[in-house]
Each structure stands twice: as C-alpha cells, then as structure tokens.
Amino acid sequence: MFLFVAMISPATAAPTVFRFAGQSPPDHMATKMMEQMAKEINEGTKGRVEVKVYPASQLGNYTLVMEEMIRGTVDMACMSVATDFDPRLEILYANGYVTGYDAAKKAFDPDAWLPKKLNEFLTPLGVRLIGSYIEGFIGIASAKEAKAPLDPKVDKGLLTRVPNMVCYTAGAKEMGYRPITIPYPDVYQSMQTGVCDAADGYPTAAAYTILGDVIKYWYATNYSMEYLGYMVSDKSWKKLSPEDQKVFLDVAKKYTLKSIDNAKAEDEKYMQLMEKKGIKVYRYTEEQLRPIKEACMNSWEEIGKAGAGTELMKEFKQHLGNI
C-alpha cells in the first residue's frame, strides 16, 4: 500500500500557483503577453507551476503590489516599478538613454548593466526583476508647433505638461521646453483650455487615444519610454527549483525582446492613425536624435542630486551614454 501511494504521489502533486498581477486592461497587449507567458511557463515547467493572470490592477496598484510581493502574498507582476521603495530606482525613468528600438534591446536585455543594477536595489527589498515590458516610446504631443524641435538650445515656445518627477522636469528643460506639472487626469482639459501647449510623458498610443482631439503635432523624439517590469517576489522565487527558475528567466527574456518589437509596430500604427486624423507627425532617426540624447544626459546629474546618487549617475552615463 505504501509503495502504491509513493508511486502515484509525484504525478498527482498539486502545482505551485503563482498570482501574476498586471495594471493594464484585459484587452491590452501587455495583458495578452502576460497570458502568453503564463501559458509558456505552465508548459515549460510541465505543470509544476500554474500561473494565473490578474489584469487591470485587480490585486492593487503598482505600489500596493510591490508591497505584496515583498511580503510574498503576490508572486509576480508586470507593472510600473515603484520608486518609493528606493530613490535609486528612478534611474529607470531618466530621459535620453535610449532613443530607438535596437538600443532598447541592448539596454533591457536581462543580462545587461541596467537590469542587473536595478536588481541590486530590488533584491534586498525582496523582489527580483526578471524582464521588461516596453509599451512604446514617448514623444511630445502639442497643440502648437515647436520651434527647432531637434535643437535643445532653442526655446521651443511651449508650456509643456510633465509628470511630477525630477527626471521629466529636468529632461524637458534640457530639451528646450518650459515644464509645468499637471495631474494626468487633467491634461486633456488643460490642453483644450490653453493652460498648457504640449504634453510630455505620453507614449504614442496613449497620445493618440487620450489627446488625439486636442493635439496638432506629434514629435517622435523618443527621449523616454513607457516601461513595466516583469518582477517576482523573492519568497515565491525560492519555492521554485533551479530548473523551473530557468524556465521563468527564459520566458521573461523572450517576452522582453518581443515587447520591443511590438512597441515598434504599435508606435508606427498609431503615428499613421495620427496622420489620418490630420495630426502632423515628425519621425526621426537615432542619429537625428543624438543632440536631444546629449541634452538629456545633462539632466542625469540632477537626478543624482535628487536622491539617486551622483556616483550612480556617473556609472549610468558610462554604461548608457553611448548605447
């Protein structure tokens, strides 16, 4: 009898269930990729791990989910990285370190300097970054034409909404824009009523879907990107065998690169939709964007002084200044 039980127990053992938290709507590409990842992890671990996807912030917003991952009550996430837990994490949102899709693949390869550095800050908190989701590049959406958009030394003549983060405020100034902080829900009305002329911080798709009726120009300056991290609770990670950990890492790397290819296609799709709507779209090569990248690099020192640390930003510049 004992022998019979021992023989069947491995085959009937219940799988380890991972709750995978997302912040995007159910029909969003980020959620679709989460579902594809869940399927491939389930298959790759031969059913030993069952990943269940919870989109649309069902398990909480990104800050709460980070807290839950630290506790081990949420296993993994595809969400914004909460910088509240360590100001050094804000390097992720620095402007100008990648201005194109090939550069993004180099910067966000899980074995590259930036993901490894981010893990130096996240692992002590109890969270591991295993990959990245790049939704799309960020440009300038404007109701008025910008003066010399590729020359950072020229005042653009645009009062520009920026997210309330040092990296965006400092970056906008270096690019020649006059920054003003306006809450995200109020940007449309602010542009409609002339409180501001332009908006910084919107990826291409969001600029079209949210601001498409109030903008006349889109400058694809690619100085930043909409970023989500594939993160795993360290407590949950330690429940996995080395073999199953490798499955997670391989799948996360695959979907990091896949997200960047998708971002390129989505950015172009929405720029074409802008053009059909009558919005003037300016596309640029990475070579044309080099002056903007160099201008944004001047803002990195300010990010260091604001809490990230000047030595860290020097290291950041060394590794990402010429990518």
PLM features: what roles do these ranges have?
Residues 1-7:
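Bacterial N-terminal signal peptides
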Residues 14-105, 123, 128-323:
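N-terminal secretory/targeting leader peptides
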Residues 7-13:
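Sec/Tat signal peptide C-region and signal peptidase I cleavage site
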Residues 102-121:
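A gly/proline- and charged-residue-enriched helix-loop-helix capping module
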